[in-house]
Amino acid sequence: MESTDVVVIGGGLAGLTATRELMRKGISVILLEARDRVGGRTHSVVESGGTLVEHGGQWVGPTQDRVLALIDELGLETFTQYSDGENLQYSNGTHLRYHGAIPTGDPMQAADLVDAMVELTSKAMEIDPSAPWNHPHASFLDSMTVETWIASQQYCDGAKDWIRTLCRALFPAEPGEISLLHALFYFRSGGGVEKMIGTINSAQETRVSLGAQEISNRLAQQLGDRLRLNCPVVRIDHSDSGAVIHHEHGSIAAKRVIVAIPLVLAGRIRYSPPMSGVRDQLTQRSFMGSVLKVHVVYSSPFWRESGLSGHITSDTGKVQITFDQSHPDRSEGVIVGFMDSHLGRIATQMSYEDRKAEVIADLVRLLGEQAANPIAYYEKAWIDEEYSRGAYVGMMTPGTWSTLGPLLREPVGVIHWAGTETAIIWNGYMDGAIRSGEDAAQQVSSSLSREEKIK
């Protein structure tokens, strides 16, 4: 049987980073990836017409220091997300133009939204992102959903609806599905609500010219034969002295294991002996967001001619969030849209033809008749992905953080955990994935060093 010091499971940014860090420390390591590619929830494809389609995660922004440093180290070029012109809010059949992260067309709604952003960020900054369960009111915050909080506020209906749309876009899940404590942790992890929803000086500021997946591709090139694709892990036999990792094509013995995949997928691996009941409860109570991401390609970015940025929020239709996805090196115009949360779940049950027709109808309502005749259409339903089962990130149901949260990053014997869901900073983002991989590698390295000293 093949043997190594460490087996890493999952070839996304967390697993790739952990593997590279261990290699740098002189530790033998093998990375097992279930797919035929690396990148996890980043997936960049250049289509036949030359259009770069970012099916998965794509943006980076200020304070995401680890991913920005890695992009620079790997020699990747970036460009700024297009944001010139006015954003658009479609509400109650009316088009309202505005600048900035928050719609300003309705003064009452704008004032309420500012208050809401301040309130949520203020509450979030009280959370210790390394231990949300230690907040003095953690149980109370964890007992309610985001929807419960929204309904309890005195904001106008328009502001409440926009906050719901924001929730679906960020997580993406229904406000009634997410613990308020989880939402506050998430906002704290990203530095505040406004920093997470904006473009300029915010999380959606920058894109990688060759696509975000190229970060993973270049990391993979450094691993050589330590990377094994098409190797879904089905069982981990573990003891105090090590583990045997069984995948579909063989088995590998290791001293330590890093499981760098979402909790939902980690819970589908068979463990012998089984995980404790409480650890299994944690994976049972984590769920992935639901999103179907679409790219609609036009001969030119015609919306710019009327002074629009391409960033739209809508209270109607399946596509309720859009951005200008056009590449500066290309002449075509591209709108990227998101069918989030329950809208995404509904959309995946439609036929491809009906779904495409509804997307185009949504864009016609938002951008006018010029949107009726795209030259290409691409989509990806992340909830249908066997080795993701959703995106952008795993979330906690009410009551989970306050009772089971301490187990999230706690090793189980020789098994360690990584992945953006375990990140303290920029949880759910590429930056968080990288940080989690670095942390897991350091944890494993320290454990192996202690074992050597004991010997």
Spans of model-derived segments:
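Flavin (primarily FAD) binding-site architecture
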Residues: V259-V278
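Dinucleotide-binding Rossmann-like beta1-alpha1 core, especially the glycine-rich loop
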Residues: T51-K123
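Conserved beta-strand-loop-beta-strand element in the redox core of flavoprotein oxidoreductases
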Residues: D237-I252
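N-terminal Rossmann-like FAD-binding beta1-loop-alpha1 element of flavoenzymes
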Residues: T4-L31
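Active-site/ligand-binding neighborhood in enzyme catalytic cores
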Residues: P129-P232, S239-A243, A260, R270, ...
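Glycine-rich FAD pyrophosphate-binding loop
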Residues: M23-S48
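Short hydrophobic core segments
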Residues: V7-I9, L32, V233, S251-V264
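Conserved flavin/dinucleotide-binding core of flavoenzymes
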Residues: T4, T17, K25, H99, ...
